[in-house]
Curated annotation (Swiss-Prot):
Organism phylogeny: Eukaryota, Viridiplantae, Streptophyta, Embryophyta, Tracheophyta
GO BP terms: actin filament bundle assembly
Record's protein name: LIM domain-containing protein PLIM2b
SMART domains per UniProt: LIM
Compositionally biased tracts (Basic and acidic residues): 194-205
Chain's gene name: PLIM2B
Keywords: Actin-binding, Cytoplasm, Cytoskeleton, LIM domain, Metal-binding, Repeat, Zinc
Domain spans labelled LIM zinc-binding: 8-68, 102-162
Record GO terms (molecular function): actin filament binding; metal ion binding; transcription cis-regulatory region binding
Signal peptide, first to last residue: none
Main location: cytoplasm
């Protein structure tokens, strides 16, 4: 009896990963031996990993690297160039309106091809791909993920700096998961919009 092939590629080494050796984290496949901290190469567990732009770290070094630089733009090795995967319009008009099994990771409602954005193996409505704290619109280069909860870098840095660690960020993330209703991320406030413009180098006229 021969084993059937698989199209799954490890998110770290980009080599084929078979079911018996596969870990699926945030919708992405990994070899068990590749699920390691990028900084110290220590083996990671579901309970002790953090992710920045798809790059894995143990929580100890994720916190340490932030303290050394004061932000997440330094000392972090850049991950793979990963642009949001916008689903192409199907060639047949009828297929545009057909059913789909994809659920938005933020609101858990059905997401159709024309309104879908895909990041780290998760599907989102374009309108749901926002910071869980301030509601800022995110891009593939401006988001941080902690236990599958999305943040913009500005608010992720801000939440970290409040107490020097992200224990309270995890508590807030868990609270959001258990809250009833699965509401959408908050709309950005005026202050948040101004901060986002300043970060992008756009000034008010």
């Amino acid at each position: 009896m021969s084993f059937t092939g698989t199209l799954d590629k490890c998110n770290v080494c980009d080599k084929t990963v078979y079911v018996v050796d596969m870990l699926s984290i945030e919708g992405m496949p990994y070899h068990k031996s590749c699920f390691r901290c990028t900084h110290c190469k220590g083996t990671l567990q579901m309970s002790n990993y953090s992710s920045m732009d798809g790059v894995l770290y143990c929580k100890t070094h994720f916190e340490q690297l932030f303290k050394e630089s004061g932000n997440f733009s330094k000392n972090f090795q850049p991950g793979k160039t990963e642009k949001p995967e916008l689903t192409r319009t199907p060639s047949k008009i009828s297929s545009i309106f057909c059913g789909t099994q994809d659920k938005c990771a933020a609101c858990e409602k059905t997401v159709y091809p024309l309104e879908k954005i895909q990041m780290e193996g998760e599907c989102f409505h374009k309108t749901c791909f926002r910071c869980a704290h301030g509601g800022c619109t995110l891009t593939h280069s401006s988001y941080a993920s902690l236990d599958s909860v999305l943040y913009c870098r500005h608010h992720f840095n801000q939440l970290f700096m409040e107490k020097g660690n992200y224990a309270h960020v995890l508590q807030a993330a868990n609270h959001r998961r258990t809250a009833s209703g699965n509401t959408l991320p908050p709309e950005p406030t005026e202050d948040v919009a101004v901060e986002a413009k300043e970060e992008n180098g756009v000034s008010e006229s």
